[in-house]
Swiss-Prot record:
Lineage top rank: taxon: Eukaryota
Underlying gene: mlcH
Biotechnology: applications noted: Compactin (also known as mevastatin or ML-236B) and the intermediary metabolites Ml-236C and ML-236A are inhibitors of HMG-CoA reductase involved in cholesterogenesis. Their hypocholesterolemic activity might be useful for lowering cholesterol levels in the blood and reduce artherosclerosis and coronary heart disease.
Name of protein: ML-236A carboxylate methylbutanoyltransferase mlcH
NAD keyword on record: no
Alphabetical keyword list: Acyltransferase, Hydrolase, Transferase
The protein's Enzyme Commission number: 2.3.1.-
Length: 418
């Protein structure tokens, strides 16, 4: 009998195997009706990696011919909180144009925000106890979620405030419902996830004299050649005809069509924190531009500022403590839940390498959106990735596992080529 020979896998064979396994996992998830569909994309700084794959369908509802229309690279998607990166870019463009400053008092453009009081609790009769804010709110606070604002659905005080009738449920899809809740702390005191980018959007509009849609078309879409990005979906019948539906996972794991208001009505105004619709390919153009520092959106120095940790040691600890005690929210998406994180201008910064050199590196910037959208830019490796589903709720275990498989497969490509 001939002696056995151990075959040592090469980096190339390992990378090919990881990509094959990843693609098989996505296809299996579609076949088993665990997800309706997804698009995954990756681009590298040097152009060696240019990967795009589309899986499954953009809806669980069959068309008149009993077909499930496919998910494609230009399928219009609801970005939800992935909009926040775009609004951050627009705010920084205003800074570059000399219209605003990161550290000036926003009172000049947002007196309604500056005058807002802080909710501290309720008295024995159930009346809200309010106090004046201490300190000034800066644009930097809005871009880093340190202004003292919180989303009403995330904070117990605001939930009680709403339950007592202080905040009425909006009858229309209007931005004022997002801007109405009072602050729950002073600026610069803690990291709280809230309607900061919606307020930043209002600041941009007042600084420029145009709405966010017009500013975005001129300053993001035109430079990058994007034609399918909008806050105003109902005014784009070409996009409406091809858009993805929203899908929701039931408690038993099955999928159902979600007739979301977002797809039937435009907001009364542009939501800087969650209002954009666009195709995956167009969003990747934004990520790629930032990664390459090509100057089409922002100057090199401004982009580098986005990747600098913006929170001091005390604020960073508070942010990490909050994130570690709310794993159900999982702001970091694919990030391991106990790793050290900071916040830059636009997203969460990983303050250490993930899985040695096999995954994201220290200094990578990431965020996402409620329908399990995850983007990340890794300047150390020179790689940006995008994973898009249109499936809720956020932090879905199946989507999260598939996202990690995809990212690690792309990083295996980087190791193979270096």
């Amino acid at each position: 009998m001939a002696p056995s020979i151990d075959v040592i896998p090469t980096a190339a064979s390992t990378a090919a195997g990881m990509i094959s396994d990843m693609e098989a996992a996505f296809k299996s998830a579609v076949k088993l009706k665990q997800i309706p569909g997804a698009v995954v994309m990756a681009r590298s700084m040097n152009g060696d990696i240019d990967y795009t794959r589309c899986f499954g369908a953009r809806t669980v509802e069959r068309d008149e011919c009993q077909r499930l229309p496919p998910m494609e690279i230009d399928t219009p998607l609801r970005l939800a909180s992935a909009t926040k990166l775009l609004t951050t870019i627009m705010a920084l463009q205003c800074m570059e144009q000399g219209l605003v400053d990161l550290d000036e008092n926003v009172n000049r453009l947002l007196p309604d925000l500056s005058d807002m009081q802080v909710l501290t609790g309720f008295d024995a009769a159930g009346n809200a106890i309010m106090r004046d804010r201490e300190g000034i709110i800066k644009l930097r606070h809005l871009l880093t979620h340190t202004s003292g604002l919180s989303y009403a659905f995330l904070h117990p005080l605001l939930q009680e405030y709403m339950a007592k009738g202080y905040l009425k449920t909006a009858e229309k899809f209007g931005i004022q419902s997002r801007l109405a809740p009072p602050a729950i702390n002073d600026p610069g005191v803690e990291w709280i996830y809230g309607a900061n980018l919606d307020w930043a959007g209002k600041l941009i509009e007042r600084a420029t004299g145009v709405d966010l849609e017009e500013f975005m078309q001129k300053n993001i879409c035109e430079p990058l050649g994007i034609t399918d990005m909008t806050f105003k979906l109902q005014q784009r019948p070409d996009m409406l005809a091809r858009r993805s539906d929203q899908t929701r996972r039931n408690e038993n794991g099955s999928l159902r069509y979600d007739d979301s208001v977002y797809f039937r009505h435009d907001g009364e105004e542009c939501f800087g924190g969650q209002g954009v619709f666009c195709g995956p390919e167009s969003y990747m153009k934004v990520l790629n531009s930032l990664m390459k520092h090509d100057g089409l959106l922002l100057k090199k120095d401004t982009i580098e500022l986005m990747f600098q940790p913006a929170l001091d040691a005390e604020l960073e600890k508070k942010m990490n403590d909050h994130m570690d005690t709310t794993p159900h929210i999982n702001y970091g998406a694919a990030l391991p839940p106990v790793m050290r994180r900071n916040f830059g201008l636009g997203g969460i910064i990983a303050m250490g390498d993930l899985d040695g050199h096999n995954w994201r590196r220290e200094g990578s910037l990431t965020f996402g959106g409620g329908p399990n959208i995850v983007w990340q830019i890794d300047p150390t490796v020179g790689l940006c990735t995008l994973v898009v589903f249109q499936l809720e709720p956020w932090n879905d275990p199946i989507c999260k596992d598939l996202t990690r498989k995809f990212e690690k497969a792309m990083y295996s490509q980087v190791k193979c080529r270096n």
